[in-house]
Amino acid sequence: MSPCKLLPFCVALALTGCSLAPDYQRPAMPVPQQFSLSQNGLVNAADNYQNAGWRTFFVDNQVKTLISEALVNNRDLRMATLKVQEARAQYRLTDADRYPQLNGEGSGSWSGNLKGNTATTREFSTGLNASFDLDFFGRLKNTSEAERQNYLATEEAQRAVHILLVSNVAQSYFNQQLAYAQLQIAEETLRNYQQSYAFVEKQLLTGSSNVLALEQARGVIESTRSDIAKRQGELAQANNALQLLLGSYGKLPQAQTVNSDSLQSVKLPAGLSSQILLQRPDIMEAERALMAANANIGAARAAFFPSISLTSGISTASSDLSSLFNASSGMWNFIPKIEIPIFNAGRNQANLDIAEIRQQQSVVNYEQKIQNAFKEVADALALRQSLNDQISAQQRYLASLQITLQRARALYQHGAVSYLEVLDAERSLFATRQTLLDLNYARQVNEISLYTALGGGWQQ
């Protein structure tokens, strides 16, 4: 074939892959450029923030062991991983339409008359067929690109599940510690109340107390037993939640009291840029979805233009296998085909409108994800200082209550106050100890939330 005859095919191939998709531009972030870190502790002079791996952030070795186990066995993470594999296969399936398709075939037939001349007629044939869509206007290219972005979005979704799992396992473990510590305090308080009851009962025998004080002492004992039963149920539920996250029902680690040194504090630069949110997998997933919607506009635009496909083949046919591949038995064909959209009652325009509206929806979704992420970080930053102040005040209040209880007991022994004063001091001390535990747990959870909101938890 002469070069002149090859030229049209070269031009066609050069044009293949042109795209009508709009140029992608990342939307501006609809949030302030920096987070407000005024009056916030743990601010350093670093120029930027770097996420620590979760093995560094979590100091407690037991937490690290549980997270490692969950990353292997958790069903939600397995499902997310399988969805990534499915999306990858779907992308390969869609992308295959952009390339030539080559198929071979072969057949044989035997026929004859039932009566008369009963000679058998034989016919053998082979063929090789090729087809290719000349993607002049990028319909297939943009469809493939949209599927690729969907696949990458699924990968980001899997990362988000990974990060959430790391956070949930740590929070569930600390919740187990909290439930155990609350149970320990309730049991210790019950023992103190029982000692007080024995003391009041002894005073009643000597006439130094009365039946009312004894009944009051018995009442707080029963109330504390009820609280113990409640705490036991909470501990069992915390264990069940942890086992579900781990994806296995083996022996859990022995619950321990809350340890404030189980994780590092998130240290932040003085000028923390909101650009750090762009590394969060949920925001990256939303941007991938936006890119896919952008590519779908290109595919919808291409539907307004002609589509050309080429089909060709070679075949042979013979009544004898020995001569099947002789040149004299061969044939060839070449079938170019063009389809021009003329009238479809507005179908193509409707498809384009849908693609453009979905692209606008993806922009709104992307912006909303950023705003939600900004709020998560801002909330965690605001709560950090508040919790520190609450804990400091609660610790001072606890110290004051301990002194109050000691004095109330001394005054009661000398008959200066009623037993009700002692009960009030004991109940206040009991409630304050529980509140302090809750606040320490809330501070740990808030630090984990801040770490996760800034995109931490993916790297080890």
Where are these regions (language model features)?
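A short glycine-centered flexible hinge/capping loop motif at secondary-structure junctions
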Residues: 204-208, 412-416, 453-457
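Periplasmic alpha-helical coiled-coil/stalk elements that build and connect Gram-negative outer-membrane
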Residues: 19, 140, 156-272, 383, ...
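Transmembrane beta-barrel architecture of outer-membrane proteins
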Residues: 65, 79, 123-125, 171, ...
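Small/polar, glycine/serine/threonine/aspartate-rich low-complexity segments that form flexible
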Residues: 37-45, 49-58, 68, 107-129, ...
